[in-house]
Amino acid sequence: MNRVVVTGLGVFSALGKTTGEFEGALRAGRSCIAPLTIIPTDALIVKVGAEIRDYDPTQHFTEAKLALLDRFAQFSLVAAREAIVDSGVDFRGGPGHRTAAIIGSGAAGQTTLDENYFKIYSQGQKRLHPFTIPKLMINAPTSHITMEHGITGPSFSIASACSSSNHAIGVAFHLVRSGSVDMAVTGGTEATITLGTLKGWEALRVMAPDTCRPFSKDRKGMVLGEGAAIMVIEKLESAKARGAKIYAEIAGFGSTSDAGDIVLPSAEGAAGAMQACLTDGGLNPEDVGYVNAHGTGT
């Protein structure tokens, strides 16, 4: 089996519009949760979120291209551009046919859905844009990334709620490790700050009115945000051969299903996934120096 390494990183998020900005904000302990400005909040109980401030899509895409891109797809393309430039790979130069593109998203084109429901039910429009469906589909980011960069290997999207991008990276990792492909562009993207989406989350009564504090006894719930993070992964052998910068090695991946409550996770399921990951990577618990938790605060 091939060893798999990360050779390119790209981030476009509320916490930073590049990988460098994102890292700097993390190290400084900054928060990007603030009052929402991109949608009307009069009908909302929770009026805060992690939105990308001062985002102008025309700085990244032509008007013709924007007609095809939901907000969540826009973010993925911007992050993918940074990751691919960072990796130093030109996929059109040859490796594209041996490269996969696998992107995760739990919600897909919510902005497009919201806008078009408003046109139909509030404004009484009879016709919608002919590309409404391709624009909102969950595989839109993957498709646009492959077309923009000449990637012709396996490409698909994964939807598994908050685990979507993690599962996407895991599947991409297994494809590279097995030798099915040599490289992969993978990660996740979301743009969930729409009126309809927020009202749906409010109905679950899991939204915090101020901030997300998952490890506090005073936690009040979660806060929705938006953004994308993409990485380029490849065989260690090829990365060394081309003198690529290597950020990290992916040692293993594991996943499980709770098969229990519709919203309440089980400790056994999480423990099983972690054990599966350790086993897959040939590691012991004492080998782990950092754990990144999924802290919903609920």
Predicted regions and their residues:
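Condensing-enzyme catalytic core mediating Claisen C-C bond formation in acyl metabolism
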Residues: 3-7, 30-34, 207-283, 287-290
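Stable alpha-helical structural segments in soluble proteins, enriched in small hydrophobic residues
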Residues: 75-87, 168, 273-281
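Short acidic, glycine/serine/threonine-rich loops at helix termini
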Residues: 16-17, 112-115, 169, 194-200, ...
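Short, high-confidence coil segments that cap the C-terminus of an alpha-helix
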Residues: 181-182, 288
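Short conserved active-site loop signatures built around small residues
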Residues: 165
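Short loop segments at secondary-structure junctions
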Residues: 88, 179, 234-238
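Short beta-strand segments
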Residues: 7-10, 102-104, 159, 184-190, ...
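Conserved beta-ketoacyl condensing-enzyme motif
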Residues: 6, 21-22, 27-160, 189-197, ...
